[in-house]
Amino acid sequence: MSEQKIGKITQVIGPVVDVEFEPGQLPNILNACTVTNPGINDVPDNLVIEIAQHLGDNVCRCIAMDQTDGLVRGMVVRDTGLPITIPVGEGALGRIMNVVGRPVDGLGPIPAKTSMSIHRDAPLFTEQDTEVRVLETGIKVIDLLVPFPLGGKMGLFGGAGCGKTVIMMEMVNNIAMHHGGISVFCGVGERTREGNDLYNEMKESGVLPKAALVYGQMTEPPGARARVALTGLTAAEYFRDEEGQDVLFFVDNIFRFTQAGSEVSALLGRIPSAVGYQPTLATDLGALQERITSTNKGSITAVQCVYVPADDLTDPAPATTFAHLDGTVVLSRQISELGIYPAVDPLDSTSRILDPNVIGEEHYDVARGVQVSLQKYKDLQDIIAILGMDELSEEDQQLVSRARKIQRYLSQPFTVAEVFTGMPGKFVKVADTVQGFKEILEGKHDALNENSFYMVGSIDEAVAKDAASKA
């Protein structure tokens, strides 16, 4: 290895640090450099900074991956000669690491034999796998209307407080615990409490030994939040490429990745684009999303939460994310206001594999029947609000009655929400889900009270609940 390049800090502006190197000694862009920041702790080289720009006059502009309070001009900066590299493989399982691969769970160093750079190229077209298989989530509304492709990318879109994280936690619970393979959970700019809760839940349920957790939460500076998604993805890519595994990759929240990029972008002197986002929004997101794919070696099935600012799906951040996904689960505030959870909008959510050739004719027909019924009910709501139900034709009254039952049957108690609701969670198999909705559409349960369909698992539970209420 060539002689280590050493520079000195010339300027610190928030998370952006300017470093001057000797002439002809400039490190490459994206290289990681280290500096000792007494503001963090006394450990040498405790702060990692990543080179973002060469400004001229031997000065590099860098982005800090931790706090810069405590840095002063003239401090010595050492180039590592490599991009940020993290420990990967078996040693990383059951552990929590931060953006630069250092453990944050207080259990000592991560004993990994291999390390990888977080900046990698996406797989080639020739390496991509195109086989379509369905992943069962056990959540009725998703399995029926927005089937998940195994090895695909799904997004959970929703405004603040609509329940994105709860649905993702339920999926971690349902899929990771039934799946038996490797899971990687990446917390990007979200609440530290949620990360802590997930860690403890995984520990209690025994999934932790097969999971790697990578956190860069709200307290982290924007440099860490803009890179932690790449760190998590690199951990997942190792299991896919080197061990040929089918990996589950959960990200909460992709919007924070974009938000961190926009925070750093202005400090790097780029002129903001639409709504104040960075001009490189599509490129940054594309570089991340193109790496989340299935190859002929193994697969990555990704579930990504996407915060929707002010419930506006046309905002550049969620709108750019839409283009990369195989399916979108859109959460609606109107549905959550009705008390129906998960608050998935059955008419706004889409999946690429809602196709009779993939899921079968019966499932497809029932899903479309449910959507038609709910759409007609939506169209009639204004008339009902003004004139009342009695003014509708008999046929329309029957349609509305069934649609209201369907709407309530789309709700479901979750295992992860059991502590709040007091109701035990339900995992419903796809065949039972399809059968239940088919029976409602056919009118087999017209005599049942619509409230009997609220917060139950299978259709048999709704029938039993109705019988109990009449007893």
From Swiss-Prot:
Subcellular location: Cell inner membrane
Catalytic activity of the protein: ATP + H2O + 4 H(+)(in) = ADP + phosphate + 5 H(+)(out)
Database matches in PROSITE patterns: ATPASE_ALPHA_BETA (PS00152)
GO molecular function, one term: ATP binding
Bilayer disposition of the protein: Peripheral membrane protein
Binding site for ATP: 158-165
Keywords: ATP synthesis, ATP-binding, Cell inner membrane, Cell membrane, CF(1), Hydrogen ion transport, Ion transport, Membrane, Nucleotide-binding, Translocase, Transport
InterPro entries cross-referenced by the UniProt entry: AAA+_ATPase (IPR003593), ATP-synt_VA_C (IPR055190), ATP_synth_F1_bsu (IPR005722), ATPase_a/bsu_AS (IPR020003), ATPase_alpha/beta_chains (IPR050053), ATPase_F1/V1/A1_a/bsu_N (IPR004100), ATPase_F1/V1/A1_a/bsu_N_sf (IPR036121), ATPase_F1/V1/A1_a/bsu_nucl-bd (IPR000194)
EC numbers: 7.1.2.2
Record GO cellular component, one term: plasma membrane
Taxonomy, superkingdom: Bacteria
Stated family: Belongs to the ATPase alpha/beta chains family.
Function: Produces ATP from ADP in the presence of a proton gradient across the membrane. The catalytic sites are hosted primarily by the beta subunits.
Protein name, UniProt field: ATP synthase subunit beta
Name of the gene: atpD
